[in-house]
């Protein structure tokens, strides 16, 4: 039953109070574990992402060490079921392209077409995950347009499929974007203690870190959380919605 393999879980957490969010990222990923049991990972600014195969809990003996080694007040994380690409550590997420880390929940069906737009890359579409191709295209669009919002408004027209992304930039900002059709769920929450913002696939991850649900991320919305607090913009004005009914039955 192919659809079961199309759900991953993403999370992005930022503490304006300079609290180490890594233990929270791990708790959130454990709460999202039912969305992907193949691999998991997390990323902080200016460091290669940490990626592991299997369940989050299988690494519980290393949690303390990971929290110390990757200590950061901003991070993103991912639990994976493979959609396109091989089930190995290389295709596990978050992925890092230049100075942007990317975690993706969804499926992009025109990978080959999209990869033709990505010039001078070192992979062939056969071994590239859909996320890698989208991330490389996005980074080249950011280089041309200077802004993530403008890049997403172009990418959404080039890409066929569904997406919820969390991004992390090396200048220490967490971003979240939900596709214009709202096919995949995305919610945001806040925790007073440490002034922590969280964006994630499901409210279970918000409860897991002791935060409160604030609202759904609107389809076509890009959220940025940084030292300047939370900013939001729309990268799409498409009003057609197409929620995945499978999400409601399987993950609710």
Q: Positions of the model-derived regions?
A:
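Conserved short alpha-helical segments that host acidic/polar catalytic motifs at enzyme active sites
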Residues: 1-252
């Amino acid at each position: 039953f192919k659809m079961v393999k199309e759900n991953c879980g993403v999370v992005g957490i930022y503490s304006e109070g300079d609290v180490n969010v890594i233990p929270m990222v791990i708790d959130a990923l454990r709460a999202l574990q039912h969305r992907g049991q193949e691999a998991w990972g997390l990323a902080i600014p200016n460091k290669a992402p940490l990626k592991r195969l299997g369940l989050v809990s299988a690494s519980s003996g290393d949690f303390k060490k990971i929290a110390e080694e990757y200590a950061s007040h901003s991070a993103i994380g991912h639990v994976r079921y493979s959609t396109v690409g091989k089930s190995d550590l290389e295709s596990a997420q978050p992925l890092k392209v230049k100075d942007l880390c990317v975690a993706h929940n969804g499926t992009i069906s025109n990978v080959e077409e999209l990869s033709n737009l990505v010039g001078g890359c070192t992979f062939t579409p056969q071994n590239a995950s859909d996320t890698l191709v989208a991330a490389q295209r996005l980074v080249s669009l950011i280089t041309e347009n200077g802004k993530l919002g403008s890049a997403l408004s172009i990418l959404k027209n080039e890409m066929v499929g569904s997406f919820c992304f969390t991004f992390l930039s090396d200048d220490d900002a967490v971003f979240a974007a939900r596709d214009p059709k709202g096919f995949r769920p995305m919610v945001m929450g806040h925790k007073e203690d440490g002034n922590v913002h969280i964006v994630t696939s499901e409210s279970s991850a918000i409860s897991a870190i002791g935060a409160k649900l604030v609202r759904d991320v609107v389809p076509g919305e890009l959220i940025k959380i940084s030292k300047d607090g939370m900013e939001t913009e729309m990268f799409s004005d498409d009003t057609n919605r197409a929620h995945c009914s499978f999400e409601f039955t399987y993950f609710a």
